[in-house]
Amino acid sequence: PYFFVKHPPSSREKEVIQRLNGETSIVEKKDLFSDERKRLTKVELEDPSLLTVASRQLKERWEVHIPYLLSYVYDHNLVFGIPYGLNGETLKPQCKINPKINRIFLEKFVEIKEKDLKKFQMLEEWFLFCSQPIPKIPLDKLGIQANLEYEKIYLGFLLSRVANLPLPVALTNRHVSTWIKSILHFYLRRENILIPRASELRRDEKPRRIPGALTFPPKTGTYFNTVVVDFESLYPSVIDAYNLSYETVNCSHPECRENRVPETNNHVCTVRRGAYSILIGALKDLRIRWFKPLARDDSLSDEERRLADAASRLLKLILVSCYGVTVRIPGLSQPALAETITAYGRYALKQTWSLAERLGLRPLYGDTDSLFLDDPRDELVDLLIRTVKKDLRLDLAIDRVYSVCVLPRAMKAYFGIMKDGTPEVKGATAIKSSSPPFIKKVFMECVRELADVRNWAEFEAAKRSIRRVVDEAIKRLKAGKVPLEDLAYQVKLHEDSAERLVKDEPMHQPYQCAVQLMDSGIKVTRGSIVSFVKVKPFIYGGKKYTVKPLNLVKNVQEVNVEDYVRNLRTALSQVFKPMNISFDEEKKMTLADFI
């Protein structure tokens, strides 16, 4: 175990080192930000537990936080989870690869090898590691006391190899930030770069609010043949394409200051390739261009496709976190880097929207990394994709096609019917997890009426069918024919019910339910999920209550039917208002009129 201090150490640092019986030597390491070599005093200790003592007593120290086991593995260029052979006293990797598969890999990534050698080297290494067979070793020999299915063991080995973590950690640690830290630290140690302290990585900036993604308000209405294009792994792609890393954002080179980041005061280095950009870019390419296509390759067996899909999902988990960790995780956060990532994300969507309009396409809605296009010509979509690749260096692809797409006024809420009739619903009130099954079922029945719609005539017929579905549902409700369990809301409690009870204020419905459950002898705590039915108002404990726990409702006569009718119409209106569906032909009222 060891750590570094400045060279030469101060008299106080020397005293601390002597008390710890540390041995010192002079080493040279590269500074991540200046790329200059600096002399440091390396302090080696006999006992790893003394690292904690050193971290408390020495203010200016580096790499004291790196776990001893990982530090040893990094220094000896070892990788967890891959096969080794013992050659004398030296461990040698025993990685083998099928020549045919290796040739396919090299052909697929030849362009990256020519243009970005450092990224290719990481890509090739991870490809080699991930291609190794999973050894048939009893898990208890590896310190794992559990029976796991093969896919979990496979993913554990993959994560162990990619993030260079011990297999037990890879199988149990769900903190993606830990994985990313290990990936970054191993790379920096191999490049002989001093791993910065958390404050240095932040550039001594304090955490601040980072502007988020861009959303274009939807053009409300119903559309046929809506094509949705999206950026494949937008933030990882931005990090890769624009060389975004801790040391490249706001670098010290005067010649780089003209390379401004849109809508910010930041600039990006044009002299050096960034470490974070290399690593995230390589992981992104490995997922998108290798494992993702393998998961869809019909020439492979079902098992091979399933494992490729699992690998793709694992890498995606790392990639979707690559922005978030730069915002809030100590040792990975840097406000300027996080701000630059989202700025380029907004820039990409804004430029693509403008380009689509210039090409004569009709963009309807844009959110973060997706663009909805109204009945576009195939050749124009292809031109948009090619131009985005050329101008923005980002990959745009067709994600899905809706035969019918309904865009309400609310952002991040829409539904569409796929070409095969499958409904896809996003953000609609009716399908929130807490909504009762009755409302969810009615909503999905309405959506299914649109499954075969391809033109306006079929759409008008479907609207009439939807009206009948809702009318029939309301009739069943009023006749008491809806089972009580279908009327139950399920809500998680975020506060202690006993504390809410002593507050002199109206009690929200979930806590009304919780109080009644506790009074009946059922234990309810913060985090509990309660199930309740809206009933006709009654007095309970001197307060007006409007719900009862599902198990305490005696019959359907207690149900507040009008409340459910109102909630049903409110939930459906979010989606159906743009469709102008009326429920009363004589009055020509729309769903919105009932709210």
Annotate each PLM feature.
Residues P1-E125, A146-G212, T220-G221, I239-S245, ...:
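DnaQ-like (DEDDh/DEDDy) 3′-5′ exonuclease domain used for proofreading
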Residues E46-S49, C130, R377:
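Helix N-cap/beta->alpha junction signal
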Residues P99-K113, G274-G331:
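Active-site cores of enzymes that catalyze phosphoryl transfer or operate on phosphate-rich substrates
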Residues L106-K108, S131-Q132, V229-F231, D375:
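Residues immediately flanking
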Residues Q132-K141:
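Short, basic/polar, glycine-containing "phosphate-handling" surface segments that engage DNA
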Residues I134, Q145, Y402-V406:
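A short acidic, often aromatic-flanked loop/helix-cap motif at beta-alpha or helix-coil junctions
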Residues L139, L159-C251, R257, S299-L307, ...:
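DNA-dependent DNA polymerase catalytic subunits
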